Structures are given as C-alpha cells and as structure tokens.
Swiss-Prot record:
In the C-terminal section; belongs to the MinC family. It comes from Nostoc sp. (strain PCC 7120 / SAG 25.82 / UTEX 2576). The gene is minC. Residues 60-366 are annotated as: MinC domain. InterPro entries: CAP/MinC_C (IPR016098), MinC (IPR013033), MinC_C_sf (IPR036145), Septum_form_inhib_MinC_C (IPR005526). Interacts with MinD and FtsZ. Keywords: Cell cycle, Cell division, Septation. GO terms for biological process: cell morphogenesis; division septum assembly; regulation of cell septum assembly. Residues 1-59 are annotated as: Unknown. It comes from the Bacteria. Cell division inhibitor that blocks the formation of polar Z ring septums. Rapidly oscillates between the poles of the cell to destabilize FtsZ filaments that have formed before they mature into polar Z rings. Prevents FtsZ polymerization. It holds the Pfam family MinC_C. Residues 1-42 are annotated as: Disordered. This is Probable septum site-determining protein MinC.
Length: 366
C-alpha cells in the first residue's frame, strides 16, 4: 500500500517540478500506483529524497556564489581584460609584444622570458650550416647555456621548427653531421633526431661529441663518431666573436604575434611579419611579403646591414644600435623598399632608388 506522502503532487508547482527541468524524466500523465507497473510516475522515497537533496544543495551553492566575490568570473575573463604594457620602442633590448590568445609554447623558438641579452641569445640556439655537401646541425654547448635552462625538449622542438619552416635550397637525402659538443644525448634522443631528419628527407650519419656517454650511444645506434676534446671547446670560446656569420636562414611561414625568430646570420622570409612578430638577425633581413612587426638587422653591431620588404609597414625597425619608429600615418601606396643607415639615422627608400644610390657610390669611389 502506497501512502499519499509517497506520491508527489505532479500538478502542483512543487520542488519536484523543478527537478524535471534538470533532466529528471517524469511522466505526469500516468496515475498508476502499482509498484510492479513499468511506468515511472511513482517516484520511490529514496529517489525523491535524493532529488530534493540535490535541489537543496544547488540552492545553497547558488546562494554562496551570489554572495561571494566574483573571483572565478574575473579569472576566466582575465585574458580579455589584461592591459598589456605598451611596447616601448626606445627600450633596450627589444621587448616582444605578447598576444595572450596566441599559441606561442614549439612555435615559440625563444620565449619572452628568455630575452635578456640579444648578442648572447642569438647564438644560444640550434644552428644549421652547410659544409662540403653535408648539413651541420650544431647544438649550443652547456658552457653557453646549462641543460637545466635549455632542455632536450627545447632542442628538439626548436630543430623541428627550423626544419619544417622550409629551406628551398635543401637537397634531399643530404647527410647530416650532428655537432653535439658537451651535450649529453642517449640512444632514444638520437633516434628521435634521426626520425625528425628522415621526415624532411635528411639522413643522420655522424655525431661529434666530447661526452663519452653520447659517443657510446651514437656507436650503438650505428652512427660514425668524431670524438671532440673538451679543451678544444674551451679554447674556442674566446674566439666566438671572430667567427663568420651562420648560413642564411630561409623560412616559408608567417611570423605571427608573439613569435620571435633569432638567427646569427641573414634571414630570408617568404611570408609576412604580423604586428607583434619579431625577427632579429646578425645579418640582413629580407621579407618577401608584408613587414608589419619588428625587424632588427645587424644585431651584432653591423651598421651596413639592410632590411628589405615588398611592403614596409613596420612597428619598429632596428639596424645595429639605430632605432626607427613607424610613421603616425600609414602610406597609401606601397613599393618594395629598403631600410639602411645614413648619417641622420635609419632611412627607408624605394628599392629602385636605393640601387641607383649604391651604383652612384660605387662609381664615385676612387
């Protein structure tokens, strides 16, 4: 026998009708009271109590949330309300503009926190050089940056980015010589490198290292090994400033906001540099596209370096220690232009005029 207290008033605006709005399935048209019936119209006491308890808890949570400070709401909306500091175009070194909505953590070759000294950081990266028909992949030494600050994940992601950015001059099936110096690598890491090279039709053939463990791992994996002496690495450090620039870096991509490219040589970009994007090079910077971000050529102090672009709309230009800001009014017509240093500072001229000027200077030279 079912008492009246066990049957809720389905026609009233009781708390159970609120439960129905919370996806609890009830058939209000059935009036059957048989416990063996297949209808769900009679709700057991336990289930009814659980629903009422659920509604009670929800009501308490709602009251707490309405009385508490809007902490969660402020946290979730923080990216939309963060007031990023304006980019000070006169500060040293260049401060990259950060886009909180960008995915800057594989593509970020150098994060904003790592920008401490331009001249030092230019060489603290994986370098690619061509020599005698083979590709040299040079890892930074632990003397330059400890393994705790430049981890294997950083090395691997940076190398993948450099390879996948696209080098039009790269020949397929080119052999790769890995110069690991004093970096400690195991067999698993060497295998990851070999697979990464294989994805872009390159073949890892040899490893140069001063670490015995790395040499053993390389031999075990079937690679030729060139044993380096630690003294050689130490003695070569003071001569680092006299070494020639690295090979030109060719990229096919768009440098988006929050992305920074640094290279100890010339950078040739087939694509755009968006506002907030940064390219820093010890050599020239050639942009076969729109330059709307920051470009710093001659970062090592070479005032003869140039910045060239098909469409020059920079946020900031730097050549060596000279800085130029963008004009307040954007030009209405665009031409291929060249930025270079004069006695009055950085000057931007049409590429045709620059060529004529250069020819005139050459002709005037005794």
């Amino acid at each position: 026998m079912t008492s009246d207290s066990a049957i809720p008033n389905l026609g009233s605006n009781s708390a159970f009708s609120d439960a129905e709005s919370n996806s609890t399935v009830v058939n209000p048209k059935s009036n059957s009271t048989s416990p063996d019936a297949e209808s769900n119209s009679v709700i057991p006491d336990a289930e009814l109590n659980s629903v009422l308890q659920y509604l009670k808890l929800n009501a308490e949570v709602t009251n707490v949330e309405s009385d508490a400070p809007m902490v969660d709401e402020q946290v979730n909306s923080a990216p939309a309300h963060i007031n990023l500091p304006d980019l000070d175009l006169d500060l040293e070194p260049i401060s990259p503009a950060t886009d909180v909505n960008s995915n800057s953590g594989w593509l970020s070759l150098n994060s904003p926190e790592s920008v401490v000294d331009n001249k030092v950081k230019n060489n603290i990266q994986v370098q690619l050089k061509t020599e005698a028909g083979r590709l040299l992949v040079v890892l930074p030494t632990e003397l330059q940056v400890p393994a705790t600050e430049f981890t294997w994940s950083d090395i691997w992601q940076q190398l993948k980015f450099r390879l996948n950015a696209g080098d039009r001059l790269r020949t397929r099936n080119t052999t790769v010589h890995l110069v690991a110096y004093d970096r400690l690598l195991d067999g698993r890491q060497l295998q990851q490198l070999a697979e990464t090279f294989s994805e872009v039709q390159l073949q890892l053939k040899s490893v140069a290292t001063s670490r015995r463990q790395t040499a053993i791992a390389a031999v075990t994996s079937g690679y030729s090994v060139e044993q380096l002496q630690p003294e050689t690495i130490l003695s070569s450090e003071p001569k680092a400033t006299s070494t020639p620039q690295a090979d030109a870096l060719y990229l096919e991509m768009t440098i988006r906001s929050g992305v920074e490219i640094r290279h100890p040589g010339t950078v040739i970009l087939l694509g755009d540099i968006n506002p907030g994007g940064i390219v820093v090079a010890d050599g020239d910077i050639l942009v076969w596209g729109r330059l709307r971000g920051i470009a710093h050529a001659g970062a090592g102090g070479n005032r003869d370096c140039l910045i060239m672009s098909l469409q020059m709309e920079p946020t900031q230009l730097r050549i060596a220690d000279a800085v130029a800001r963008a004009p307040e009014k954007s030009p209405t017509h665009f031409f291929p232009e060249v930025a270079h240093i004069t006695s009055q500072g950085i000057r931007i001229v049409r590429s045709t005029d620059f060529s004529r000027n250069q020819i005139s200077k050459i002709n005037q030279t005794p």
